[in-house]
Regions:
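His/Asp/Glu-rich, glycine-adjacent segments
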Residues: 61-189
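N-terminal module-boundary/linker segments of secreted carbohydrate-active enzymes
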Residues: 2-21, 25
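Loop/turn elements at helix/coil->beta-strand transitions in domains of secreted/extracellular proteins
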Residues: 3-8, 33-38, 106-112, 156-162, ...
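Catalytic metal-binding/acid-base residues of hydrolase active sites
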Residues: 15, 167, 200
Length: 206
């Protein structure tokens, strides 16, 4: 198992490129100093949550993986996909390509997902070993606790790939504006939460 790395992929939805310079984000700043950063990024089109998150998971553009918008009509299925429709979100027929958790499982690695787009549906008949149906009422701290519990499992049960999604600061920035005090407070809160996750990861067993 030592040659199989542990990867935790975290998304802060709609975290604007300059939020870390506008607001106090010491955890993200430290991660950037000690890790790798990008100077620019071109999102997939359309710049919506579901198409872009599934593009991250598959490496494919929306016209190749099938999620072309947050809501759309699929003529081949004669169905309307909506992000709030649990039956559609969990219908694997909408999801093309191969998300990274499917690749991981094919390679004998366990995977886990806390709300990543596509994880609620069987893709190629495969889902993460551990996953949660989306529920925005679950506190962010509880999500981190669950991820840390997954990574504390015995080695033969422990996921090597974990995807973790937070719907903020998207919701608050749409409600109050990207430069509002409310968005700033959310950005700083998320940074603190990442600090909790980072500290927890450092304490995990080998």
């Amino acid at each position: 198992e030592r040659d199989k790395p542990y990867v935790v992929l975290v998304s802060l939805d709609a975290f604007r490129w300059d939020y870390d310079s506008i607001h106090s984000t010491p955890v993200l700043d430290d991660i950037a100093r000690k890790g790798v950063t990008a100077t620019r990024l071109i999102p997939s089109f359309p710049t919506k949550t579901f198409p872009n998150h599934y593009t991250i998971a598959t490496g494919l553009y929306p016209d190749h993986h099938g999620l072309v918008n947050n809501s759309f009509y699929a003529p081949d299925l004669d169905l309307v996909y909506r992000i709030g429709d649990r039956a559609m979100v969990s219908n694997g027929a909408f999801y093309g390509g191969e998300p990274v958790w499917v690749t991981a499982r094919k390679q004998g690695m366990k995977s886990a997902s806390f709300y990543w787009v596509g994880s609620e549906a069987p893709v190629q008949g495969i889902q993460p070993d551990y996953w949660k149906p989306y529920d925005e009422e679950v506190p962010f701290g509880d999500r981190i606790d669950t991820v840390l519990k997954w990574l504390s499992l015995p080695k033969n049960q422990r996921p090597h790939l974990v995807t973790l999604y937070f719907e903020e600061p998207d919701a608050v920035s749409h409600g109050y504006g990207p430069l509002s005090p409310e968005t700033g407070a959310m950005v700083m809160s998320l940074d603190s939460l990442l600090g909790v996750l980072r500290t927890g990861l450092a304490k995990l067993p080998d």
